[in-house]
Amino acid sequence: MAKKVVNVVKLQIAAAKATPAPPVGPALGQAGINIAQFTKEFNARTADQAGSIIPVEISVFDDRSFEFVTKTPPAADQLRKIVGKGSGEPNTKKAGNVTLDQIRAIAENKMSDLNANDITNAMRMIEGTARSMGVTVDGVDLTVEGTAIKEDAE
């Protein structure tokens, strides 16, 4: 008989830096997860992605065992690595610029986690994240133009 999922915990943790300290420890403790076992497994699985924030979805079963799925780093985190920072006032102050090729690379990386049917739609989602961070795409101010992606971007 299959195990019954009793709880799902979603967290964003720095890769290879999960510790029993807050905020990770209390969230896992409330769910009844063996904190030491989770941190050891998470740190081992994400060791190659050091420096990134990794979203993780932990399914807790009725026998207090668990399994977890790591996702790709958030688009905002990937854009921040390229640009260096986000803007506190995205409509007036621009934080930096990215190219369409960089947007495409992020979209291809995140494609499995995005609700998009093709790469163009995924690129538009990443472009929206860039807009909210005050980042221009190929010099195009997305708050004015709306999009820098042409229909033939594929």
Curated annotation (Swiss-Prot):
Entry keyword annotation includes Ribosomal protein: yes
InterPro entries for this protein: Ribosomal_uL11, Ribosomal_uL11_bac-typ, Ribosomal_uL11_C, Ribosomal_uL11_C_sf, Ribosomal_uL11_CS, Ribosomal_uL11_N, Ribosomal_uL11_N_sf
Molecular functions (GO terms): large ribosomal subunit rRNA binding; structural constituent of ribosome
A single GO cellular-component term on record: cytosolic large ribosomal subunit
Entry-linked Pfam families: Ribosomal_L11, Ribosomal_L11_N
PTM summary: One or more lysine residues are methylated.
Oligomeric and partner information: Part of the ribosomal stalk of the 50S ribosomal subunit. Interacts with L10 and the large rRNA to form the base of the stalk. L10 forms an elongated spine to which L12 dimers bind in a sequential fashion forming a multimeric L10(L12)X complex.
Family named by the database record: Belongs to the universal ribosomal protein uL11 family.
Descriptive protein name: Large ribosomal subunit protein uL11
